[in-house]
């Protein structure tokens, strides 16, 4: 089995080579699929992420969610710690792109100071680098989503990816959290 580092390198390279037209078609399909998932339909709070480096663009869901009366939230890293402490991730209220700023890790964050209090009607839509169809996930190595989900087991989770991000097997550790769903342009796995 390849190491997480080797898998990250290979998948990130493949994702970076995905042309913008193919990516756009894929993430439009992925977002439409999410709209039909029960945990999205019942969610009052929808946590999205600001895509970077050719990630699936789930911000297409922001407008639809707000039109449906859902509150939309995006991640923010706080207390960026020392070398041995990665920091903490919270979700701030999303109020539109004109109310954002580039934060740590060059990720766009909301300027809102309102922080999500996750509940049973909270849905977290999360990125990742690589996945298996048994819902194992490799992120970027910071553990932000894993820690957030360990602290908030009541939330529903959907991970999104392109088919090219799916691999046969991933080494998993005790702290690695599986999403409830993995959604790609061709499949939904639960």
Model segments located where?
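N-terminal active-site beta-alpha-beta segment that forms phosphate/nucleotide-binding
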Residues: 1-120
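Conserved phosphate- and dinucleotide-binding cores of soluble alpha/beta proteins
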Residues: 81-190
């Amino acid at each position: 089995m390849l190491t997480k580092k080797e898998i990250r390198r290979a998948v990130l390279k493949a994702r970076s080579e995905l042309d913008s037209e193919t990516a756009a078609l894929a993430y439009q399909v992925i977002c439409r699929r999410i709209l039909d998932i029960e945990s999205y339909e019942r969610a009052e709070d929808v946590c999205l992420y600001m895509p970077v480096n050719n990630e699936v663009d789930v911000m297409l869901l922001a407008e639809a969610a707000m039109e449906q009366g859902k509150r939309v939230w995006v991640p923010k890293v706080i207390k960026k710690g020392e070398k041995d402490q990665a920091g903490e991730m919270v979700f701030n209220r999303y109020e539109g792109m004109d109310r954002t700023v580039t934060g740590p890790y060059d990720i766009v964050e909301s300027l809102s100071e309102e922080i999500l209090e996750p509940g049973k009607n909270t849905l977290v839509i999360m990125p990742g680098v690589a996945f298996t169809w048994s819902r194992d996930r490799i992120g970027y190595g910071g553990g932000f989503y894993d820690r957030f989900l360990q602290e908030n087991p009541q939330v529903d989770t959907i991970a999104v990816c392109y088919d090219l991000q799916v691999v046969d097997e991933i080494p998993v550790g005790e702290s690695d959290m599986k999403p409830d769903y993995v959604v790609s342009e061709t499949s939904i796995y639960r």
